[in-house]
Amino acid sequence: KPMVVFGMGGHASFPVCIAAKTLGIPFIIYENNIQIGKSNKYLLPFACKIFTSYEELVGIKNKYDHKVVVTGNIIREEILNFKKKNQFTEDVLNILVLGGSQAAKSFGEILPGVFQECKKENVNIKIFQQCTESQNTKLNEAYKNLNFDFELFNFTNNISEYFSKAQLVITRSGSSVTAELINCKIPFISIPYPHATDSHQDKNATYFEKKGYSISVKETEVNKKLFSLIKSFYKDRKLLDRMIEQQKKHSDKEVFVRINKTIKKLLNE
């Protein structure tokens, strides 16, 4: 019989935590979005603690504030220990485009037009873009016609290799990838998925922008705003440096120390 159960949020951990409650086993839940998820919201009244990635947590009642422990993001050791190796030049801006299958498809459709504007305005960029296999040929032809350096990839087990190459990232505002970017001190433009449950990606993006970690652009405004942002970053790298300085104020290095300390204290009560 376990002494404590740790639920990482989402549908998978929900029945396990309910079983723990039924058996009288204390459990802890973890929320890595700014907006508490539905499963965690239901479980919170019965949980001993809720670990959070950031200081802000939307969607909980004040009476549960005492259960909140800000631990930071639970992320891979490879990312926790990430150190950027590449040296960058002022005459080119390296942009990494990240997204899962849905995001990759959307970005593959809307970004070529933005990058075409960069070419017209002599904004010298190099693109590393995650795309779906079905987009390989079309994007390859489009970017070759624009005559700038680019690399397309579908999936990688070594994302840190691409992080090392990036000065700016264009991504959705899901909790996992943004946590890794903040830890690696890489400025990013987040384009929230407009149909995310409880608009949690919008809330993540708003929080990150408020903190100065990133810039948020709604998908409906990409064609209007994204080129201007890229041009600004290309012309003035200090804008990127400011975001990096803000990201340095957030640290996940002690996340496992904080978690272990809280669990040990709980078990000794």
Regions found by a protein language model. Name each.
Residues 4-23:
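An aromatic- and histidine-rich active-site surface loop
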